[in-house]
Design a protein with these regions (language model features):
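Bacterial N-terminal signal peptides that target proteins for export
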Residues: 1-11
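Short amphipathic alpha-helical "recognition" segments used for binding
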Residues: 6-8, 97-98, 135, 260
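Hydrophobic helical h-region of N-terminal Sec-dependent signal peptides
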Residues: 10-18
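Acidic/polar, low-complexity intrinsically disordered N-terminal segments immediately downstream
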Residues: 14, 26-92, 145-294
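C-terminal motif of bacterial Sec signal peptides marking the signal peptidase cleavage site
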Residues: 19-23
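Hydrophobic, gly/ala-rich membrane-insertion helices/peptides used by toxins and envelope proteins
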Residues: 85-150
C-alpha cells in the first residue's frame, strides 16, 4: 500500500514538475506589459533619445534583462537550426532575435558589439542561408542607424539595395587603401585605422566628431604589428580591433558562438571570411550613412 502511495505521489510530483516547466517555458517566451513597452520603443524608434546618462543606463539595463531572458544560447541554437525555413519563427520571435542587434547602433559605436553576433543570427533565421551571415550583421543595424524600421527590414525592405551600398563602399575603401602608396606592411594597426578613417572622409565626407573620436580611441589590444598586406587578413585584423574595443575575445565569433549556434565551418579560411564579413557589415552600417545613397 505504501509503495502504491509512493508511486502515485511520485507520478503526481513528476507531472506537476512537467506542468511547471511547460508553464515557465511558455512564460519565458511571452512579453509582459513592461517588456512590450520597451520592445516597442526599440523596434519603432529609428534613433533613440535619452535625456541623461542615468536614463541610458536604466534603458540599457532593461534591454540586458530582455536579452538575458529571451536570447539564451539554447534559443539562438534553436533559431539557427530551424532558421532555414523562414516561416518557422513567428514575427515576434524574429524581433526578439533582432532585439539584441539594435541597441548597439542606437547607442553609438561603444553601445555593444554583440549586435554583430545577433545580427548574424537574425540573418540566418530570416534569409535561411549561412552566406547571409556576411550581410545581415550590418543590415539590421543599418536599419536602425539610418531610420529604417527594423521590422520593415525583416519584411524585406529594399535589403538588396542596402547590401549593395554596404558592399560597394567597403570595397571602394579597401581598394583605395591597398592600391595607394600607404605602407600597409610596416604600418601599425592603429596607424592603419587612422588612415582608413582619413581615406573614408576623403571619399565620402566627414564623420561626426563623436563617432570619429570613438573610432580613433579603439583599444588595439592583441593585434599583431605589422599587419599583413593581404586584404583578407588586413580586414580580419581590423575587425579584431573592434572586437577588442568591446572587451570580447577576438575568437568569440569563430569558436564559442559558432559552436553554440550549431554552425560548422570547413576550415580556418572560411572562419576568417565570416569574421571579416560580419565586421564589414559593422563598419558599413556604423560609419557610413546609407540613406539616400544610389
Amino acid at each position: 500500500m505504501k509503495k502504491k502511495i509512493f508511486m502515485v505521489l511520485s507520478a503526481v510530483a513528476v507531472l506537476t514538475m512537467g506542468v511547471l516547466i511547460v508553464a515557465c517555458s511558455n512564460d519565458s517566451n511571452t512579453l509582459n506589459p513592461n517588456e512590450k513597452v520597451i520592445l516597442e520603443e526599440v523596434v519603432t524608434t529609428p534613433t533613440l533619445q535619452k535625456n541623461s546618462a542615468a536614463e541610458w543606463a536604466a534603458f540599457n539595463l532593461e534591454i540586458e534583462k530582455l536579452k538575458a531572458k529571451y536570447l539564451t544560447p539554447e534559443v539562438v541554437g534553436r533559431a539557427m537550426r530551424i532558421g532555414r525555413d523562414s516561416g518557422a519563427l513567428s514575427k515576434e520571435e524574429k524581433v526578439l532575435i533582432v532585439l539584441a542587434d539594435l541597441w548597439g547602433g542606437a547607442h553609438g559605436v561603444k553601445g555593444g558589439l554583440s549586435f554583430g553576433i545577433w545580427g548574424a543570427v537574425a540573418g540566418a533565421v530570416i534569409e535561411g542561408a549561412i552566406e547571409s551571415l556576411l550581410m545581415w550583421g550590418g543590415l539590421t543595424l543599418s536599419g536602425c542607424m539610418v531610420g529604417i524600421n527594423p521590422l520593415s527590414s525583416i519584411d524585406g525592405l529594399d535589403s538588396d539595395s542596402l547590401a549593395n551600398v554596404i558592399g560597394g563602399r567597403h570595397n571602394i575603401l579597401i581598394e583605395k587603401i591597398m592600391t595607394s602608396n600607404i605602407d600597409v606592411v610596416n604600418m601599425s594597426s592603429h596607424a592603419l585605422l587612422v588612415e582608413i578613417t582619413n581615406q573614408y572622409e576623403r571619399l565620402f565626407g566627414p564623420l561626426p566628431n563623436l563617432l570619429k573620436s570613438s573610432i580613433l580611441s579603439m583599444n588595439i589590444g592583441e593585434i599583431q604589428d605589422p599587419i599583413s598586406v593581404d586584404i583578407e587578413q588586413a580586414t580580419a585584423q581590423y575587425v579584431n580591433m573592434i572586437v577588442d574595443l568591446n572587451g570580447i575575445q577576438k575568437h568569440a565569433y569563430t569558436e564559442e558562438y559558432l559552436e553554440v549556434m550549431d554552425i560548422t565551418l570547413a576550415d580556418s579560411e572560411e572562419k576568417t571570411q565570416m569574421l571579416a564579413g560580419i565586421g564589414t557589415g559593422y563598419h558599413s552600417a556604423s560609419l557610413w550613412e546609407i540613406e539616400g545613397q544610389p
